Curated annotation (Swiss-Prot):
Keyword Acyltransferase: yes
Protein name in UniProt: Alpha-tubulin N-acetyltransferase 1
Assigned keywords, A-Z: Acyltransferase, Transferase
InterPro entries in the cross-refs: Atat, GNAT_ATAT
Domain N-acetyltransferase span(s) in chain numbering: 1-177
One Gene Ontology cellular component: microtubule
Top enzyme class: transferase
HAMAP family from the UniProt entry: mec17
MF-aspect GO terms: tubulin N-acetyltransferase activity
């Protein structure tokens, strides 16, 4: 995304952290328009009607934008290369053994690299800078409804190849749960970037956080949950199997095929839904 101006006095280094206060202090319509245009390209790739990221939303939220850009000395223009939007959210999580966790997790909410600079290491530079600024490790990151391409990127660049899908469409990695330890089923673990509480396995999960469409057996005034292993694990062809290795085609043709498949599945879901009128 191109801006016909020198943004070095405004943004500073080529990798920059923009929190809500910093974005509000920019007061530059050209920068705002360039960020919004880059976010629209991200939404277009995900087949979304409205972008997930705008400067107005960032100013009125607790999210942080990590932006990569460069200045072209020959053409005297600035180019925005990509961005990552992150925020901290309180989530209830399940591991592969259905142990329940509660914690404030660093979440990747939006991530995009301009198509003209993809596969040049820009995406990894952005995430590496984000991890250093947030004092976090790759396994501590939660992904908000990621695509197969993003899961393949995390597997290829960071070795995160065991995703655990949650019923909230967030994805965390099995290494996160392996790093936690508990005593007698209940415990707390503190990191610089997150805090988790492990629920007692004898207690049922909090209301509203049970996995949907799960058969139940009613007893004497109590509700016991029976987990079906084949239902919990999901289907590998959908790319959201519980703790299943990621098998994604990272070639340009494969990325386009993944996006086309996701758009086709989303269109079929919309057409099969009952109209509201």
């Amino acid at each position: 995304m191109q801006v016909n101006a020198d943004l070095r006095p405004i943004l500073g280094p080529q990798l920059v952290r923009l929190d809500p206060m910093r974005i509000k202090q920019l007061q530059d319509p050209q920068v705002y328009d360039a960020i919004d245009s880059l976010a629209k390209l991200s939404a277009h790739c995900l087949q979304l009607r409205t972008p997930l990221t705008t400067c107005e939303k960032l100013i009125n939220s607790d999210s942080t934008l990590y932006l990569s850009w460069k200045y072209d000395e020959e053409e005297k223009v600035s180019r925005l290369l990509g961005f990552a939007k992150v925020g901290r959210k309180k989530l209830f999580l399940y591991d592969a053994q259905m142990q329940t966790y509660e914690g404030e997790v660093l979440c990747l909410l939006d991530f995009y690299v301009h198509f003209s600079t993809q596969r040049q290491g820009v995406g990894k530079q952005i995430l590496d800078y984000m991890f250093s600024q947030e004092h976090a490790e790759p396994y501590q990151l939660a992904l908000d409804n990621p695509s197969v391409t993003l899961l393949g990127f995390m597997s290829q660049k960071y070795g995160m190849n065991r995703p655990v899908w949650q019923n909230t469409n967030f994805v965390v990695f099995d290494e996160l749960f392996q790093s936690l330890s508990a005593e007698n089923g209940v415990g707390t673990v503190d990191f610089q970037s997150c805090k988790y509480r492990i629920f007692n396995s004898e207690k049922s999960p909090p209301d509203g956080w049970r996995r949907p469409m799960t058969p139940r057996r009613l007893g004497t005034g109590m509700t016991d949950t029976r987990w079906l292993q084949h239902a919990v694990s999901g289907h590998q062809s959908k790319g959201n199997a519980m703790a299943a290795p990621v098998d994604a085609d990272m070639t340009p043709q494969g990325a386009l095929s993944n996006r086309a498949h996701q758009a086709k599945a989303r269109k079929a879901h919309i057409l099969s839904s009952k109209p509201l009128w």
